[in-house]
């Protein structure tokens, strides 16, 4: 014969199970976004991150403004071609990289520099994303999962560098390895498609080198023997908006 308390334990266990099941169902009915967010975070970003991501690597850039020529936009053109952006941009076209001319107060020497997603170690765009569409790979690259992005644009407001764009218009002539989508937010990916193919250079750095300026150096910041690490040790560098303590992966010399 069963102990008299066995049926009580079984009933209690059944009630707990049914209670959890009901709570789960209520969660789906009342707040479907919660479950979708968890699914997106568990599957979407990790799948989108690709098998090429290496936790021992931190990809980054060094921009030497003393070598960056005012009026030169070869880096912008190369980025547009590589990623299938508009060859003739309109006011609403996406900009993954843009040239900015500055004249620092008290110095009087104009500066020209490219600004793109800074691939922060503490990215505010990821913090504010309600669906998990904005995420950071283990190798430091900050990306957007376009299957999960709902176009709320909170990340655009959170980015202190204004480095993200919203796709307003239908897209044509997309690159197979650079999927994009109307109604989504996007930004510089450090040419992640190249990295995952084993190529260790970005289109903008390659184009800048071809001009002879060599103002953009791309590489692994965690490798002490990489060119970017050697250059960072040899010259003074700063981050844009260093006061925010976001630890950007893009460093600048000469600002």
What are these regions (language model features)?
Residues 5-9, 46-54, 67, 102-108, ...:
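Asp/Glu-centered strand-loop micro-motifs enriched in Gly/Pro and often flanked by an aromatic residue
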Residues 22, 26, 84, 196:
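Hydrophobic/aromatic-lined pockets within catalytic cores
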Residues 37-50, 80-113, 135-148, 163-186, ...:
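Non-heme iron-sulfur electron-transfer modules
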Residues 62-82, 109-132, 143-162, 180-211, ...:
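Cysteine-centered iron-sulfur cluster-binding motifs in ferredoxin-type domains/subunits
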Residues 11, 31-70, 237, 242-255:
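C-terminal segment of N-terminal export signals and the immediately downstream linker at the start
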Residues 2-25:
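N-terminal secretory signal peptides and thylakoid transit peptides that target proteins
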Residues 196-199, 203-255:
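Long, compositionally biased charged/polar accessory segments in the mid-to-C-terminal portions
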């Amino acid at each position: 014969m069963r102990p008299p308390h066995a049926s009580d334990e079984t009933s209690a266990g059944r009630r707990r199970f049914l209670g959890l099941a009901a709570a789960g169902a209520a969660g789906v009915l009342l707040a479907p976004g919660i479950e979708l967010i968890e699914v997106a975070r568990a599957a979407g970003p990790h799948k989108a991150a690709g098998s090429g991501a290496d936790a021992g690597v931190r990809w980054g850039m060094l921009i030497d403004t003393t070598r960056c020529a005012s009026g030169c936009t070869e880096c912008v053109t190369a980025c547009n071609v590589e990623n299938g952006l508009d060859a003739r941009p309109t006011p609403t076209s996406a900009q993954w990289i843009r040239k900015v001319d500055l004249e620092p107060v008290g110095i009087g020497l104009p500066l020209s520099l490219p600004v793109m997603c800074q691939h922060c170690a503490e990215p505010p765009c990821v913090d504010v994303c309600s669906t998990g569409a904005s995420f950071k790979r283990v190798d430091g690259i900050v990306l957007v999962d376009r299957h999960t992005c709902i176009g709320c644009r909170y990340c655009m407001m959170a980015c202190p560098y204004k480095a993200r764009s919203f796709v307003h218009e239908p897209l044509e002539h997309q690159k197979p390895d650079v999927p994009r989508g109307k109604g989504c937010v996007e930004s510089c990916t450090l040419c992640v498609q190249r990295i995952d193919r084993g190529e260790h250079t970005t289109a903008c750095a390659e184009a800048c080198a071809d001009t002879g300026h060599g103002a953009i150096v791309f590489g692994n910041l965690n490798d002490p023997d990489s060119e970017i690490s050697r250059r960072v040790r040899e010259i003074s560098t700063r981050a844009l908006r260093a006061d925010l303590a976001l630890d950007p992966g893009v460093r600048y010399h000469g600002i």
